[in-house]
């Protein structure tokens, strides 16, 4: 768990007087870091009794061809480019905006695999 609330220090380094303590809703979680491998999902409970599906590993993607609007299920071979972090390419981590090599060709990921539990992508011409 990671605290995502306000810092307890000023920009000068001095401590702020806190009117209250930390709250559970201010906690975040570690990133999913979706890898290219056999499918592995994890359900995470969220606010209001809902749930999020964390995609930990995936080897298929829903790839849409923008020219004709058709969507096919295609196998993911590797991660080609990732603007979020250059080291993610080496580790084959899929995030939104990363370019993956599929059987249909190179595609840009449009979904958030760690939040949505699925890899959706659009073919790059």
Curated annotation (Swiss-Prot):
Pfam families reported in the protein's UniProt record: Ribosomal_S8e
Sequence segments annotated as region (Disordered): 1-34
A molecular-function term among this protein's GO annotations: structural constituent of ribosome
Keywords on record: Ribonucleoprotein, Ribosomal protein
Single GO cellular component term: ribosome
Summary of subunit composition and partner proteins: Part of the 30S ribosomal subunit.
Protein name: Small ribosomal subunit protein eS8
């Amino acid at each position: 768990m990671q605290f995502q609330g306000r810092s307890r220090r000023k920009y000068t380094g001095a401590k702020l007087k806190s009117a209250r303590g930390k709250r559970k809703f201010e906690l975040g979680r570690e990133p999913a870091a979706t890898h290219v491998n056999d499918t592995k999902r994890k359900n995470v409970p969220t606010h209001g009794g809902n749930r999020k599906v964390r995609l930990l590993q995936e080897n298929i993607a829903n790839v849409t061809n923008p020219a004709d609007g058709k969507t096919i299920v295609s196998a993911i071979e590797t991660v080609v480019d990732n603007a979020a972090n250059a080291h993610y390419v080496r580790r084959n981590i899929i995030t939104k905006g990363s370019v993956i090599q599929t059987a249909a060709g190179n595609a840009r990921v449009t979904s958030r695999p760690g939040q949505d539990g699925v890899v959706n992508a659009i073919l790059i011409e």
